[in-house]
Design a protein with these regions (language model features):
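Outer membrane beta-barrel strand-and-loop segments of large Gram-negative receptors
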Residues: 88, 103, 107-168, 174-188
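Residues on the lipid-exposed face of transmembrane beta-strands in outer-membrane beta-barrel proteins
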Residues: 2-6, 40-44, 97-101, 147-153, ...
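C-terminal beta-signal and adjacent terminal beta-strands/loops
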Residues: 231-309
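Outer-membrane beta-barrel signature, preferentially recognizing the C-terminal barrel domain
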Residues: 48, 60-109, 116, 134-146, ...
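Surface-exposed extracellular loop regions of Gram-negative outer-membrane beta-barrel proteins
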Residues: 1-27, 33-41, 159-163, 168, ...
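Transmembrane beta-barrel strands of outer-membrane/channel proteins
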Residues: 15-21, 42, 54-58, 99, ...
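Outer-membrane beta-barrel translocator domains and adjoining extracellular loop/strand segments
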Residues: 25-34, 65-73, 78-80, 112, ...
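Outer-membrane beta-barrel channels and translocator barrels
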Residues: 8-11, 45-49, 92, 102-106, ...
Length: 309
C-alpha cells in the first residue's frame, strides 16, 4: 500500500493505491483474483470554521471458506443449508461527501454516502423435494444510500452538552430472481451535564437497520440514564438501561417469496436494569502513540457453514 498526501492553500488531498490477491481452492473448485485498491480523499476548507470533504475507494470482497464448501447441513425438517463452490469475489464501490461547520456554541454536519456492490454474494432460496434449500450465490447488485445530519450545542461551555444525529438509509437489493427495496429512519440523541466532579447523562437511540439479500436485520433501540462521580483517578458510576420499556426487542425479517420468516428476540432483563461501575486509572511508565495499520493480512475464517435459518 502506498499513499501520497499534499496541501495547496485551503485544499488538502490524499491519494492511495494498494493491491490484494485472493486465492482459494476446495475440492477441485476455487478462484484466484488480483485487485487494485485505490482510495482518494479531497478536502476543501471553505472558512476557518467549515469544510467539505469527499472520499472514494473501491475494493474486492471474497467469499468465505464456509460458503465455498460443497456440504449440506439440515437446519430443521423443512430447511437445508448448502455451500456453493462456484462463488466468486466481487467489487465494492464506496464514496461519501461530508460537510462540517462550527459557529459559536453550535457544531453541525451533513453526511451523504453511497455504497454499490457488483455481483455481490447474497442469499438464495430454492425448493427441492419439498424442502427449502438456502445457499449463497453471486447476485446482480446491492446498494445503500445513507444521508445523515448531526448537531451539537454547548450553551454553557462544558457544563452542558447536547448532541443529536438522525438520518435515512435506503437499500436496493437485486438478486437473480428477487428485488427488494427498504428505507429506514434512525436517530441518536445524548445530553451530558457536568459540574465539578459530578456528571449526569442520558442517551436515546433508534438504531439503523440493515438490509442485505432478502433479510432485514434490526439494530437495537435503547435509552440510558446515568451518573458518574470522579475523584482523581477513581470513577464511580451508576446507570439504568431502558428504564421506560418492559422488554428489549430484536430480530430479523426474511422476505423470500417461497419461505418468508420472522425471528424475534425478547429479553426482559435488559429493561429497567441497574448497572454499577468502579474504575481506577493506573497511569505510569512511558506513553507511546500508535498508528493504525492500513492493511491487515489476517485469516479468521473457521470454515464452518452457518446453520442458522
Amino acid at each position: 500500500y502506498a499513499e501520497f498526501k499534499g496541501k495547496v492553500k485551503r485544499f488538502n488531498y490524499s491519494l492511495g493505491i494498494g493491491g490484494t490477491r485472493s486465492w482459494m481452492s476446495a475440492q477441485g473448485n476455487g478462484y484466484q483474483d488480483y485487485t487494485l485498491r485505490p482510495t482518494i480523499s479531497l478536502k476543501y476548507n471553505l472558512t476557518d470554521k467549515s469544510s467539505i470533504k469527499y472520499t472514494a475507494n473501491l475494493y474486492s470482497s471474497s467469499p468465505s471458506l464456509s460458503d465455498l464448501e460443497n456440504v449440506e447441513q439440515i437446519v430443521d425438517s423443512m430447511q437445508i443449508r448448502r455451500g456453493n463452490s462456484q462463488l466468486k469475489p466481487y467489487m465494492v464501490y464506496a464514496h461519501s461527501l461530508n460537510y462540517e461547520m462550527s459557529k459559536g456554541i453550535f457544531n453541525g454536519g451533513v453526511y451523504v454516502g453511497h455504497r454499490y456492490s457488483d455481483n455481490p454474494i447474497m442469499e438464495s432460496t430454492t425448493l427441492e423435494n419439498g424442502k427449502f434449500v438456502r445457499s449463497m450465490e453471486n447476485q446482480k447488485s446491492w446498494q445503500r444510500l445513507n444521508t445523515e445530519v448531526s448537531i451539537s450545542v454547548k450553551p454553557f461551555k462544558d457544563l452542558l452538552t447536547m448532541q443529536f444525529s438522525g438520518g435515512m438509509a435506503h437499500f436496493d437489493s437485486r438478486g437473480l430472481n428477487y428485488h427488494h427495496t427498504y428505507t429506514n429512519w434512525y436517530y441518536n440523541g445524548t445530553i451530558n451535564a457536568t459540574y465539578k466532579d459530578w456528571s449526569l447523562y442520558g442517551n436515546i437511540k433508534k438504531g439503523r437497520n440493515n438490509f442485505y439479500g432478502e433479510t432485514m436485520s434490526r439494530n437495537e433501540n435503547f435509552h440510558v440514564i446515568g451518573m458518574n462521580y470522579r475523584h482523581k483517578s477513581l470513577t464511580l458510576g451508576m446507570m439504568t438501561l431502558n428504564p421506560f420499556t418492559k422488554t428489549w426487542k430484536g430480530g430479523d425479517d426474511n422476505y423470500n417469496a417461497l419461505a418468508p420468516s420472522k425471528e424475534r428476540i425478547y429479553i426482559g432483563n435488559l429493561s429497567k436494569m441497574m448497572v454499577f461501575s468502579v474504575s481506577y486509572n493506573f497511569n505510569f511508565g512511558r506513553k507511546f502513540s500508535s498508528v493504525e495499520k492500513r492493511l491487515n493480512n489476517e485469516d479468521k475464517d473457521s470454515g464452518v457453514l452457518d446453520a442458522g435459518k
